[in-house]
Design a protein with these regions (language model features):
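Active-site-proximal cap/lid insertion segments
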Residues: 1-153, 161-172
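Short, intrinsically disordered, charge-balanced linker/junction segments flanking boundaries
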Residues: 82, 183-203
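A residue-level signal for beta-strand positions that form part of recognition/binding surfaces
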Residues: 113, 175, 191-192
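Generic alpha-helical structural context detector
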Residues: 134, 157-161, 179-183
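Glycine-rich, aromatic-lined ligand/substrate-binding cores of catalytic
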Residues: 152, 157-158, 175, 179, ...
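Conserved small-domain helix->loop->beta segment predominantly found in fold-type I
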Residues: 170-173, 181, 185
């Protein structure tokens, strides 16, 4: 089992200068550099910041952020190539996901989540819908999708079931295995998803 946490893409934004210049040039070609990407929104709902307004990014045009995405893609490619080189790719379950939506309304608002609403720290789709890509050779069909909500706690019971293992007798798992969805079960339904997030107003 390998758990690889990339710091990309996260603040502070920083990337190799050649990559940043590549996306600065792309933004200029697309005339995105002529658009003010961040607009002032409503006042912060939290009392201690009531004198400030949310700064919301409405255009995806941050060259350093884009450079970080490309760099992360390159690094993940190295991992996948290593699996191929080791001859274990066909027997390895690979999961790529994130812990939250893009940071679109705070800390410099480096990214835009359109057409989804809001971003990290919000209960709307921009904050709760993240990439969740799974490759399980012989089980998953490339290009298929699942519309049933999946959450982070679901990963552990899914890994157990995929490996043919049971949870320890004393172990409680909050999540639900989504292996049936990976096998193409269109009727997979995990029921409602509820959680409490005491981080009011994104601050």
């Amino acid at each position: 089992l390998l758990n690889l946490w990339h710091y990309l893409v996260h603040t502070p934004l920083q990337a190799p200068e050649p990559l940043v210049k590549k996306y600065e040039a792309k933004a200029k070609r697309m005339k995105l550099d002529a658009i003010d990407p961040v607009v002032p929104g409503e006042p912060f709902p939290s009392r201690h910041e009531a004198d400030q307004r949310i700064q919301r990014r409405v255009v995806q045009s941050h060259p350093t952020y884009a450079a970080m995405v490309e760099l992360m893609d390159h690094c993940i490619g190295r991992v996948l190539r290593a699996l191929d080189d080791a001859g274990v790719a066909d027997e390895t379950l690979v999961v790529f996901t994130s812990d939250n939506g893009g940071l679109s309304t705070a800390e410099g608002s480096p990214t835009c989540n359109h057409p989804l609403s809001e971003g990290k720290g919000w209960m709307y789709d921009g904050g709760t819908r993240e990439p969740y890509l799974v490759r399980l050779p012989g089980v998953t069909e490339p290009g298929t999708t699942c519309r049933t909500p999946i959450t982070s706690p679901d990963l552990y019971p899914t890994l157990l079931e995929a490996a043919g293992l049971d949870a320890r007798p004393e172990q409680h798992t909050d999540g639900v295995s989504f292996l049936p969805a990976l096998k193409g079960d269109a009727g997979f339904d995990r029921g409602g998803v509820f959680w409490h997030y005491p981080h009011y107003g994104n601050q």
